[in-house]
Amino acid sequence: MIKSLLKSLLDDDEREVKKLRRTVEVINSLEAEFQELAEEEFPQKTGEFKERLKNGEELDDILPEAFALVREASQRVLGMRHFDVQLIGGMVLHQGRIAEMKTGEGKTLVATLPAYLNALEGKGVHIVTVNDYLAARDADWMGPVLEYCGLSVGLIVHGLSYEERKAAYACDVTYGTNNEMGFDYLRDNMVVSADNMVQRELHYAIIDEVDSILVDEARTPLIISGEGDKPTTLYYQIAKFIPRLRNEEDYKVDEKAHVVTLTEEGVKKVEKYFTIENLSENMELAHHVNQGLKAHSLMKRDRDYVIKDEQVIIVDEFTGRLMFGRRYSDGLHQAIEAKEGVKIEKESQTLATITFQNYFRMYHKLGGMTGTAKTEEEEFRKIYGMDVVSIPTHNPMIREDQADMVYRTEEGKFRAVVEDIISRHQAKQPVLVGTISVEKSEYLSAMLAKRGVKHQVLNAKYHEKEAQIIAQAGQEETVTIATNMAGRGTDIVLGEGIQELGGLYVLGTERHESRRIDNQLRGRSGRQGDPGESRFYVSLEDDLMRLFGSANVEGLMDRLGMDDDMPIEHKMISRAIESAQKKVEARNFSIRKNVLEYDDVINQQREVMYGERRKVLFGEDLKETVASMVDDVIEQAVERFAGEFKYSDEWDLPGFLSYIEQSIIPQPDFNQEDMRGMRKNEVVAFLAEKTQTLYEQREKEMGSEIMRELEKAILLRIIDEKWMDHIDAMDQLRNGISLRAYGQKDPLIEYKFEAFEAFQMMIESMKEDVVRYIFRVKVVQQPEERKTFENQGEEAEKKPVRVGKKIGRNDLCPCGSGKKYKKCCGRGVS
């Protein structure tokens, strides 16, 4: 009784799949009918489905016929017929859930089903993957199936012009990468003309490798930045000074928490070297020293980053790929550059930023697919509201997953790994060896070379050959050493006669801190019912065991008197490894959740700002908006100077008039005597009338058309400037807020409170600047006959078309035109 109850609780996936099989039967019953269709009838069917949706039918009503149509189109165009389990996967994606499908089960083909169905609504479908190669491959491969049914297919990859992007997003189905789509969203919120926006409303996205994008990349913000103006000399000074400090005595390293802290002795040395009295009062120096310590003691070359073409390039810890164009923030990247002696790039100023978590949560509906998601189901459910459904394989999975081999030392482990590889190599069985860093892959490669074993290395340094190396990895006598990248999205196909040798042997040289990454490595073998085998080798010196493992394991090995070359297989050790991984997974989830709680604050503010910006961008007549801002600024000025006094006689009238002249009405045609004896509301009415008269006068001088352009340009420019400064201020607030915990205050509540105050102040400051500019700028004719605006007040000349403070002249213009900044909005800007 209890067993059957437990089984029913555990088999949620089976129940879900069983339910969906009924719809599969309906789709299969339509197959013969759709096989009779002529080619020209496929687009006609699409038109018919769209009409039925307009007449009130739901997508679910059309689903069986839509899936049957796509299956038949795929059979004709590609010679590939969707299996029943692929139809189930397609339904799970359509429901806004995650389909966990093992490697080689045809996820790319599955995506065509929900993509076609949801594209019928005419609002666009995005199929998102992790890199340009996969996006282009999938669009070329699957696009013809959707086009056969009468849909348009677009592709978003790096390097496209603004026109190409706009056309791609206007298609029914758009393939692209998470990075490009996220950046396009940010760029759309920086353009100065509505025509330059490329994306439509975010309707439905299908994310391939969803765990990689929504979990591994969740903490990574997308940032558009301009060049900052902080000098770089301090980084060199600190890089020279750090080697004088001694670990434990001057600073302590906590690898688990990934932090370095100065001891009292260390603080004294810093103060002496930089000739300052109190380090705690010099926050900038303290921050830079801390980043320098991090760069020297926590960040390792060939593990966290590599040096390529005299540049520090980050290595993605989850995929092992080089992350070109990405930089560590907060001066850490500059600290690493100083440590390695390469050119230090200036710190940048953030113009716009968003995390993947918040970008993808803006879609009306989200579906995802991957080979490994079940271990992260709680996170998907809590953060994205998405369930994970395990889809059965088309053929039974017969790969043998062997127990871990545990060694006392890393050296002993690697000796055993080499012996295992040699014995498999002699038997001609292909071997895929997984390592967790560039450094470890090169160490193992040197050991194999010494023993004369021919092999290929696939790591961040050689990623250009990835597809070619992975394509060969299933051939006879092939040994491939790969970091975590191991070609996600590229199947390893077995060569002739390999099945008889036992299939591909996957050997993991270390357990990753996430069980999911280990499962991905195992999943390279045993695809589509092929035979295969996997085994992990572990040592007590591995990072996972050293930082999170149990001391009991080492005690057990001591008691058994085991030497370095003797492995141990014991349930207690397997449990200790799994327990260590669960600890790390829970910790990482907690960090991501905490990051999200903080990021949600700025995200809500971002949505408000971008919403207001779009109103300005699409607004034809902003006169009312500006007039309302003028009224607000007048009321605030009166409140500020009046205080509790009712009559103006009791105010500081000279100071009030001076403020009006500087911030609202330049060269007013009245004096303080004209306001004597007035109440607050009378002063407000008096000034409102004066500003209205001045506004009408300016409009008459300039003409209504130019005045409307002027309003839009000033509003956009000030919104962008204030938002950039606000992002910087919020970053600084967030970096310092953790110190509040020492004062027994909840840092998150404090952050929310102060962020709200900062946002309110930004809005007020924005209104003041708009009012100051609107009454002071005048149009001047430039030689190129471009309209710019000259400030009559104290401030320097301002050009509203310019979006960022320090965008490089050779950078692409953020307005989205696809031209260089100096040839576009930056023309004439020195």
UniProtKB/Swiss-Prot annotation:
Family label: Belongs to the SecA family.
GO BP, sorted A to Z: intracellular protein transmembrane transport; protein import; protein targeting; protein transport by the Sec complex
The keyword Nucleotide-binding appears for this protein: yes
Subcellular location: Cell membrane; Cytoplasm
E.C. numbers: 7.4.2.8
GO molecular function: ATP binding; metal ion binding; protein-exporting ATPase activity
Reactions that this protein is recorded to catalyse: ATP + H2O + cellular proteinSide 1 = ADP + phosphate + cellular proteinSide 2
Keyword Protein transport tagged: yes
Keywords: ATP-binding, Cell membrane, Cytoplasm, Membrane, Metal-binding, Nucleotide-binding, Protein transport, Translocase, Translocation, Transport, Zinc
Name of the protein this chain belongs to: Protein translocase subunit SecA
Stated role: Part of the Sec protein translocase complex. Interacts with the SecYEG preprotein conducting channel. Has a central role in coupling the hydrolysis of ATP to the transfer of proteins into and across the cell membrane, serving as an ATP-driven molecular motor driving the stepwise translocation of polypeptide chains across the membrane.
Topology class, membrane: Peripheral membrane protein
A GO-annotated cellular component: cell envelope Sec protein transport complex
Cofactors that this protein relies on: Zn(2+)
UniProt binding sites for Zn(2+): 813, 815, 824-825
Segments crossing the lipid bilayer: none
PANTHER family assigned to the protein according to its UniProt record, in alphabetical order: CHLOROPLAST PROTEIN-TRANSPORTING ATPASE, SECA INNER MEMBRANE COMPONENT OF SEC PROTEIN SECRETION SYSTEM
Major subcellular site: membrane
Source superkingdom: Bacteria
Note describing how the cofactor binds: May bind 1 zinc ion per subunit.
Enzyme class, first EC level, given as a word: translocase
Record text on subunit structure and interactions: Monomer and homodimer. Part of the essential Sec protein translocation apparatus which comprises SecA, SecYEG and auxiliary proteins SecDF. Other proteins may also be involved.
Record: residues binding ATP: 86, 104-108, 491
Cited NCBIfam families: PRK09200.1 (NF006630), PRK12904.1 (NF009538), secA (TIGR00963)
Pfam families from the UniProt entry: P-loop_SecA, SEC-C, SecA_DEAD, SecA_PP_bind, SecA_SW
